[in-house]
Amino acid sequence: MNIGVIFAGGVGRRMNTKGKPKQFLEVHGKPIIVHTIDIFQNTEAIDAVVVVCVSDWLDYMNNLVERFNLTKVKAVVAGGETGQMSIFKGLEAAEQLATDDAVVLIHDGVRPLINEEVINANIQSVKETGSAVTSVRAKETVVLVNDSSKISEVVDRTRSFIAKAPQSFYLSDILSIERDAISKGITDAIDSSTLMGMYNRELTIVEGPYENIKITTPDDFYMFKALYDARENEQIYGM
């Protein structure tokens, strides 16, 4: 069984959206979160979707599920106090749906430019190696800095990747790590791959498209609109 856990728990302070969380902003009559879920909905390999939503917008999210006929969404749950705790709540909901050896794909609700090919590659990577971290090759040089803002290391660009999403694992594995981490007071890991790395788990890269952006700022929003229109018009992709 393959389950998408889609995190839509942010409130979008950097988007200046005057109260509406960024995941609910509309592009061509459809909220960003629905654009994202649609990809999972239309991917044959996905059996179910769990949406983790900011608590004050649960009813709104449930209405979107009904309005857009998102039949693979089997649960909409409230997020936690941190991103990690929100994902944990989504994983717990997935556990209620799962069969043995379920694969879970943890994805950002504001990454609507994912595609079926990457989703399928994530599932295959988990089955072969136990993990999948969707990533892109770094286009520019990455440097590490110290507390004095001095460069302490220049990272070899040929070995540098930027981690994105989905980040995918066997559900039982990530839940086991989450529960142990929480029991030790670790509740704010930046993402699931970071948490798994803290436990020295082997992580495998799945290369994804550069356009798999996370919509965080107004610039990101307008970039998504442009890329979406380009896809729709078939003027750029596939050339």
Curated annotation (Swiss-Prot):
<dbReference type="InterPro" id="IPR034683">
    <property type="entry name" value="IspD/TarI"/>
</dbReference>
<dbReference type="GO" id="GO:0005829">
    <property type="term" value="C:cytosol"/>
</dbReference>
<comment type="pathway">
    <text>Cell wall biogenesis; poly(ribitol phosphate) teichoic acid biosynthesis.</text>
</comment>
<keyword id="KW-0961">Cell wall biogenesis/degradation</keyword>
<keyword id="KW-0808">Transferase</keyword>
<keyword id="KW-0548">Nucleotidyltransferase</keyword>
<feature type="site" description="Transition state stabilizer">
    <location>
        <position position="22"/>
    </location>
</feature>
<feature type="site" description="Positions ribitol 5-phosphate for the nucleophilic attack">
    <location>
        <position position="214"/>
    </location>
</feature>
<dbReference type="InterPro" id="IPR018294">
    <property type="entry name" value="ISPD_synthase_CS"/>
</dbReference>
<dbReference type="GO" id="GO:1902012">
    <property type="term" value="P:poly(ribitol phosphate) teichoic acid biosynthetic process"/>
</dbReference>
<comment type="similarity">
    <text>Belongs to the IspD/TarI cytidylyltransferase family. TarI subfamily.</text>
</comment>
<feature type="binding site">
    <location>
        <begin position="7"/>
        <end position="10"/>
    </location>
    <ligand>
        <name>CTP</name>
    </ligand>
</feature>
<feature type="site" description="Positions ribitol 5-phosphate for the nucleophilic attack">
    <location>
        <position position="157"/>
    </location>
</feature>
<protein>
    <recommendedName>
        <fullName>Ribitol-5-phosphate cytidylyltransferase</fullName>
        <ecNumber>2.7.7.40</ecNumber>
    </recommendedName>
</protein>
<dbReference type="GO" id="GO:0071555">
    <property type="term" value="P:cell wall organization"/>
</dbReference>
<comment type="function">
    <text>Catalyzes the transfer of the cytidylyl group of CTP to D-ribitol 5-phosphate.</text>
</comment>
<dbReference type="GO" id="GO:0008299">
    <property type="term" value="P:isoprenoid biosynthetic process"/>
</dbReference>
<dbReference type="InterPro" id="IPR029044">
    <property type="entry name" value="Nucleotide-diphossugar_trans"/>
</dbReference>
<keyword id="KW-0777">Teichoic acid biosynthesis</keyword>
<dbReference type="GO" id="GO:0047349">
    <property type="term" value="F:D-ribitol-5-phosphate cytidylyltransferase activity"/>
</dbReference>
<feature type="binding site">
    <location>
        <begin position="80"/>
        <end position="86"/>
    </location>
    <ligand>
        <name>CTP</name>
    </ligand>
</feature>
<feature type="site" description="Transition state stabilizer">
    <location>
        <position position="14"/>
    </location>
</feature>
<dbReference type="InterPro" id="IPR034709">
    <property type="entry name" value="TarI"/>
</dbReference>
<dbReference type="Pfam" id="PF01128">
    <property type="entry name" value="IspD"/>
</dbReference>
